[in-house]
Amino acid sequence: MALTLEALAARFGGEIVGDGRCEVGALAPLDQAGPRQLAFLANPKYLAQVETTGAGAVLIAPGDLEKLGAAAHGRNFIVTPNPYAYFARVAQMFIDLAAPPRAAGVHPSATIDPAAQVAASAVIGPHVTVEAGAVIGERAQLDANVFVGRGTRIGDDSHLYPNVAIYHGCTLGPRAIVHSGAVIGSDGFGFAPDFVGEGDARTGAWVKIPQVGGVKVGPDVEIGANTTIDRGAMADTVIDECVKIDNLVQIGHNCRIGAYTVIAGCAGIAGSTTIGKHCMIGGAVGIAGHVTLGDYVIVTAKSGVSKSLPKAGIYTSAFPAVEHGDWNRSAALVRNLDKLRDRIKALETALVAREGDAGGA
């Protein structure tokens, strides 16, 4: 389905420069777009591609349009302060228009406990299990093999992709999106040591601590594939509104993730950690337990966080990749830092002594 630039501007805002009757029916990169496709410029370093693109129209920021000057003549634009966000909204609209509607109802192979409540407008796919006391909200969609435990609530307009497991006593707010393989509400990693003796004579066991809290997920949260969020030991693990979590992320028990925070893939967050609002956690970041990150904290990829970071800012502890030989030389220097320190101290001591002798003379 194609829409005019006028129709897009009426829905999403922005100023049209050029022919508002130009129709676009899809999105494409600047260097690949055709005359019935809409492209966007989010990074000024690609400004030259706007001059050569075959796109029917381009989403562009006001300052970048000014830089084009005469090269903008004869082209069509929607001018907006944030072309990237505009692109995202248009893309979602095109997906919604193209998606075949799913008929409400329960697939015959699904298992719904009589004590569960499933909205008449919900879509329940094949082999879904919904246990007693669970509540499935209006227009929620549960794809094949989803499991919803007892007493769990799934908010209106939420979408659980195939093979998602939501354990008992959890809450998902409205418009939640949970991708395949995610597990929400599994037991937190809680064990009490009960050992006596030392060495080979040591006996005892790790005693499992029952995890009796739940997981509370706020509205408009998206959780990536194969991500796991543990239930709290006593209180709930909390994911606040509009948090976006990538694939393969581990969030330990009793954590609290503040609103609008984003967490990239393979990050691991140990239990009882609090992350503030509008934070950005890079890929493969490791965060120790019982620490607090303040609002607007950014932790770059592969960094390790071992203490609280209360102040907003960018934090890095990862070592960027270098050529193998350079790494070996650096590693050798690191191994000998203690010796270098001792030599410097000895030289400083000798220098002070020499200066003292010279002064006395």
Curated annotation (Swiss-Prot):
Record's catalysed reaction(s): a UDP-3-O-[(3R)-3-hydroxyacyl]-alpha-D-glucosamine + a (3R)-hydroxyacyl-[ACP] = a UDP-2-N,3-O-bis[(3R)-3-hydroxyacyl]-alpha-D-glucosamine + holo-[ACP] + H(+)
UniProt GO BP: lipid A biosynthetic process
Pfam families on file: Hexapep, Hexapep_2, LpxD
SUPFAM superfamilies given in the database record: Trimeric LpxA-like enzymes
Gene3D superfamilies hit by this protein: Hexapeptide repeat proteins, MurE/MurF, N-terminal domain
Pathway(s) served: Bacterial outer membrane biogenesis; LPS lipid A biosynthesis
Active-site residues, record numbering mapped to chain: 253
EC code: 2.3.1.191
GO cellular component terms given for this protein: membrane
Gene Ontology molecular-function annotations: N-acyltransferase activity
Keywords for this protein: Acyltransferase, Lipid A biosynthesis, Lipid biosynthesis, Lipid metabolism, Repeat, Transferase
InterPro entries assigned: Hexapep (IPR001451), Hexapep_transf_CS (IPR018357), LpxD (IPR007691), Trimer_LpxA-like_sf (IPR011004), UDP_GlcNAc_AcTrfase_non-rep (IPR020573)
Family, per entry: Belongs to the transferase hexapeptide repeat family. LpxD subfamily.
PANTHER family recorded: UDP-3-O-ACYLGLUCOSAMINE N-ACYLTRANSFERASE, UDP-3-O-ACYLGLUCOSAMINE N-ACYLTRANSFERASE 1, MITOCHONDRIAL-RELATED
Subunit structure of this chain's protein: Homotrimer.
Function: Catalyzes the N-acylation of UDP-3-O-acylglucosamine using 3-hydroxyacyl-ACP as the acyl donor. Is involved in the biosynthesis of lipid A, a phosphorylated glycolipid that anchors the lipopolysaccharide to the outer membrane of the cell.
Protein name per Swiss-Prot or TrEMBL: UDP-3-O-acylglucosamine N-acyltransferase
